[in-house]
């Protein structure tokens, strides 16, 4: 029996402890190379971001602080849907069978979560830059808002990546994404807007550490659910 066949047989059973940093790094490198070669996807998202921000500028000019904050997170949400939700939907059946034979499900899902988190950190930074250039800079604490935007982008990417993994197994993935995503995304988006308000003034917001801890705890829960549930989806 060849080494490839032995590896395939070892990886097929459901395993919750088979986490390999080397395999995760290899899969992450694969996603980065594909993104680099298919640059039309990345630049398509950039065009969407730039056009959305420019339309907001033409419509509203320089909005007030709360409106600026809300528009930023709503824009980031739709960018995340376009950038992250396709991560599993673009994988064909043949490619998924190939991955099924050579890697464990935990390594596969973790590589997707890491890649999408890095992608959304980049998009969060670009979104913030465009908003500050076109819609003004109402921020009092720019670095704080930048950190929160990266954390928020990662949080949104984790949820949508997990939902995309579930929806990819359904016959109507877009409908499944909408049905499952609405009750999860809306509370998270409202929480991000509330946390980000502190970056617009010098007033200390009560309970801010608890809100950030709640957001981080939600992210950890999503990672844990992906770690536990994705192997069963993978086997199916």
Protein language model annotation of sequence segments:
Residues 150-182, 234-236:
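A structural motif at transmembrane helix-loop-helix junctions in multipass membrane proteins
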Residues 70-85:
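Long, hydrophobic alpha-helical segments
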Residues 59-63, 67, 129-150, 175, ...:
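Membrane-interfacial helix-loop-helix connectors in multipass membrane proteins
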Residues 15-44:
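Aromatic- and glycine-rich beta-strand/loop motifs that create alpha-glucan
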Residues 35, 81-99:
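Transmembrane helix boundary and interhelical loop/hinge segments in multi-pass membrane proteins
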Residues 105-132:
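Selective transmembrane-helix segments that form parts of the transport pathway or gating/packing helices
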Residues 133, 219-236:
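Junction motif at the cytosolic side of a transmembrane helix
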